[in-house]
Amino acid sequence: NELKPYKIAINQGIEMIMTAHILYPQLDNTTVVSEKTGNEEKKPATMSKAIITDLLKGEMGFNGVVTTDAMNMKAIADTFGQVQAVKLAIEAGADLICMPTVLYSLDDVKNLDAIIDGVEDAVKKGEISESRLDDGCRRILTVKENRGILDWKESDFSLNKALSTVGSANNRATEREISAAAVTVVKNENNTLPVVVKENQKILMLCPYDNERAQMIMGYNRAKEAGLIPESAEVKVVR
């Protein structure tokens, strides 16, 4: 049953699927020695050839692009070094590596260079086959061709166009439409949803981590700008 949504999406031609950094011992219980911890570590789905290559690309017939979730997440970063993590993900069948390192400054580029050098070295040593890289490139280029972005044209993707489009009122309206369409209400007792806010009513918004308050406030302000929240509404942050 867990695979059913993926089967439906694949049959309908979905082009990209993102892996999760979860352990799924029923599908893959293999381990690898971490260069960071020195211990035998179980492979998460992002590093599992059994899940990505054998199951997803093989048995389920997915011909699109497999991208990892952010590799700087603690589930990966606390257990594996950056170079080894990327190599294991590519070897497992990942075609795109999301955030293999964090680039805060020009000095951080050296970390990206080390990752690229590590992958190149792994190919030379036969740890990663050229056919694996060819497969990933083919999948990426196929999606770009299907989307009409195989050839970059400055006139179509200019900085001025980006500045006038990204974050515009129309752009954010489209974001809200996509977000609303992506939500499926499974249970709605007493017709709680949609929430109808009355005058002077208080609404509690929670976020799991302290560093997410800024995003919550940003979302609140954008909703207010769009007229989704009354101008007279106020927000108070409680820590």
Predicted regions and their residues:
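Histidine/acidic residue-rich metal-binding segments in metalloenzymes
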Residues: 2-8, 54
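Short, well-ordered coil/turn segments that N-cap beta-strands
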Residues: 8, 13-15, 60-65, 94-95, ...
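Alpha-helix-loop-beta-strand connector modules within alpha/beta enzyme cores
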Residues: 41-67
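Active-site mouth loops of central-metabolism enzymes
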Residues: 1, 72-81
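Short, active-site-adjacent cap segments at secondary-structure transitions
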Residues: 23-27, 73-76, 211-213
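Hydrophobic faces of well-ordered beta-strands that scaffold small-molecule active sites
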Residues: 17-19, 64-68, 97-99, 140
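Preference for extracellular/luminal or secreted protein segments
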Residues: 48-49, 58, 78-239
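Short acidic, glycine-rich surface-loop motifs adjacent to enzyme active sites
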Residues: 9-43, 70
